[in-house]
Amino acid sequence: MKLKILWVGKTQEEWLRRGIDEYTGRIRRYTPLEIAEAREEKGAAAEAMRTRECERLEKLVPKNARLVLLDERGDQLTSPELAAFMGKCRDSAVPEMVFAIGGAYGFADSFRARADRVLALSRLTFTHQMVRVILLEQIYRAHTILNGEPYHHS
């Protein structure tokens, strides 16, 4: 199963880019992975920014992909539960899973309605830039769990 990670805007901080590079390399040992950035909208009201950014994200989602949004109001899973969810998708021949991280103001309701699942990484709020590294680490962790490797300690 191919993975695609979408986010809005460029990663600003070098330390975050290093983390992204580290986990991207680790994940690619298990599965094909593509990362795509949608242009960040600036200088508009929050709702207009959400709408325009989500229109850009929508164009990057393949029609046959399973779309998972990362949002603070989503379902919270443990790492083993995320691994099980990803394994179930893989085993049911889902060709591609897309994880999307919104911009600073989140997702438009129309894009949220398109999602197959909405997940929250925590009840805490993280910057949308930090979520990139956290999500990639959790995807890597899920692969190690699915492969019975010793990275995750229960």
UniProtKB/Swiss-Prot annotation:
CDD domains: RlmH-like. GO terms for cellular component: cytoplasm. It comes from the Bacteria. GO terms for molecular function: rRNA (pseudouridine-N3-)-methyltransferase activity. Belongs to the RNA methyltransferase RlmH family. Pfam families: SPOUT_MTase. It is found in: Cytoplasm. Its main location: cytoplasm. It catalyses: pseudouridine(1915) in 23S rRNA + S-adenosyl-L-methionine = N(3)-methylpseudouridine(1915) in 23S rRNA + S-adenosyl-L-homocysteine + H(+). SUPFAM superfamilies: alpha/beta knot. Homodimer. This is Ribosomal RNA large subunit methyltransferase H.
